[in-house]
Every structure is written in structure tokens, then in C-alpha cells.
Design a protein with these regions (language model features):
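Conserved N-terminal catalytic core of the sugar/cofactor nucleotidyltransferase
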Residues: 1-44, 48-58
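Residues that scaffold the ATP/ADP-binding catalytic core of kinase and kinase-like folds
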Residues: 4, 94, 125, 167, ...
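Conserved beta-strand segments of alpha/beta enzyme cores
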Residues: 11-13, 90-93, 153-155, 194
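Short loop/edge segments at beta-strand edges and connector loops
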Residues: 16, 45, 72, 158, ...
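Residue-level signal for inorganic ion chemistry
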Residues: 30, 47, 59, 84, ...
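Short, high-confidence coil segments that cap the C-terminus of an alpha-helix
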Residues: 38, 64-68, 152
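Conserved core of the sugar-phosphate nucleotidyltransferase
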Residues: 51-134, 141
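Left-handed beta-helix
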Residues: 135-252
Length: 252
């Protein structure tokens, strides 16, 4: 992960949580790099890949009128997600499912884990977190109740539940891939790319396709593929690391 991050951003700073003592403890590992900063920090998760830039922009907007902005989602199947204790757009606490009362388990607005706030405030709150809970861990979520008791305001920003899907198993990885492919198919068709059998065409994260291109069934576009305008990709083609020029026809 560190190597991949440095390829994308050579100046990135890496810290490691040697012992898994909870999400609060994990964030605390970055305190020596960020703790004295008066700047905002955005806490994201590597296994939650679908959060949109527009959603981050909403968090930034909410942060302008509150001390902390929290990303949540409303779901019919809250399961083991933490529940948000709210009053309108204000959040007064987050309760993990395993520590929740039956009444709290009935809450449908859940925590995504994504938080935006000023670095020094976040780390001051983390310093006050205890581990007296069902997992004996330091929950980052406890910061919100501590903030409320100290007079700080935490605001709720809601997003689509699909944006918060995590990848913690091979089954969830397959589900995430399915969501990704479905979104890319819609994206390209809206841009004027003709997919003759959309469910049989597979894209990569960096695929680029020009308007007017026709892609037939059972096509795989591996990484580093650019297809310019008005090309035709025949059925059963597998492309990778290539550029297809305008008006070209490519077959398997």
C-alpha cells in the first residue's frame, strides 16, 4: 500500500498502527505529523472506495458552519453499523451496534466513519477517549459525544448508501466490482459510447473512450487503454496498455 501511495503521490507521509486498538488509536498514529496543525483533516478508509468528490465537497461546506462534519447514510438494513444520535442536522453521539440499546438499534441513520475537522481538535478529543466498551478498543466515534459535551458542533452530511460500501471479504470485493462496472457502463453510455451488450463489457479505473465508439459484446478493457472517437471494438476483444485511434476497427 505504501509503495502504491508513493507512486501516486511521492511526498505522501506514511504512519503505521502497529497494534490494532481501534479506529481512534489508528488516527492517533498521525498526531506527530498533524497534531499541531490548525488545518482540517479528512479521515477516510482504504476499504471504502466509492465516496464521490461531490460528497467530500458537501462535507467541506458543512464544516464551514460546524466544528466537525460527519458523513452518514440512511439504510433499511443498518446491521452492525454505528448509529448516529441526531437532532436534525446536528449529531450528539455515535453508538457502535455492539454497544447500542434496542432503541438505538432501531435508528436507520448510520455512520460511514468519514469525519472532517480541525486537526488539533480531533487529536485533543482522541486523547480523552477510553476503551470501556464491548471491544475494549478506542473508538474514533466517541469523539462526537465528547465534542458535544465540550460545546462543539458536529454536523451530519448524508450520502447514498452505495458510497459507503466497504470491502472486507472476497464476497464484498465482488460486490464492489459489480457496482464499479455498472457505474462505468452508465457513465460511458451517457457520454455517447454504444455498448451492444453492456453487462458483458468490463472497464478499468483509467479507461478512456471517445464519443461515437461502438463496443460489441464480451470485451475486456484492462488498465491503460484509451479509445478515441468513432472506433469499433469487436466482440471477444481483450485490450490492455494501448491507444486506439479514431475510426479504427479492432478485433480479437
Amino acid at each position: 500500500i505504501s509503495k502504491a501511495a508513493k507512486i501516486k503521490s511521492p511526498d505522501v507521509k506514511i504512519v503505521v498502527q502497529e497494534k490494532q486498538l481501534g479506529t481512534g488509536h489508528a488516527v492517533k498514529q498521525a498526531e506527530r505529523l498533524l497534531g499541531k496543525s490548525g488545518k482540517d483533516i479528512l479521515i477516510l478508509y482504504g476499504d471504502v472506495p466509492f465516496i464521490k468528490s461531490e460528497t467530500i465537497s458537501k462535507l467541506i461546506k458543512a464544516r464551514k458552519t460546524s466544528d466537525i462534519a460527519v458523513l452518514g447514510f440512511d439504510t433499511k438494513h443498518p446491521g452492525m453499523y454505528g448509529r448516529l444520535i441526531t437532532n436534525g442536522e446536528n449529531i450528539f453521539g455515535i453508538v457502535e451496534a455492539k454497544d447500542a440499546t434496542q432503541e438505538q438499534l432501531n435508528i436507520s441513520v448510520c455512520n460511514s466513519g468519514v469525519i472532517l475537522g480541525r486537526a488539533d481538535l480531533i487529536f485533543d478529543l482522541i486523547a480523552k477517549i477510553g476503551s470501556d466498551n464491548a471491544s475494549a478498543e478506542f473508538y474514533l466515534t466517541d469523539c462526537i459525544e465528547l465534542a458535544a459535551k465540550a460545546g462543539f458542533k458536529s454536523s451530519l452530511v448524508l450520502c447514498d448508501e452505495k458510497e459507503t460500501i466497504g470491502v472486507n471479504s472476497l464476497e464484498e470485493l465482488a460486490q464492489a466490482e459489480e457496482l464499479f462496472q455498472r457505474a462505468k457502463r452508465i457513465e460511458f453510455m451517457e457520454k455517447g459510447v454504444q455498448l451492444n451488450s453492456p453487462e458483458t463489457v468490463f472497464f478499468s479505473f483509467d479507461t478512456e473512450i471517445g464519443k461515437g465508439t461502438v463496443i460489441e459484446q464480451n470485451v475486456v478493457l484492462a488498465p491503460a487503454v484509451t479509445i478515441e472517437e468513432n472506433a469499433t471494438i469487436r466482440a471477444f476483444s481483450h485490450l490492455e496498455g494501448c491507444r486506439i485511434f479514431p475510426n479504427s476497427t479492432i478485433g480479437p
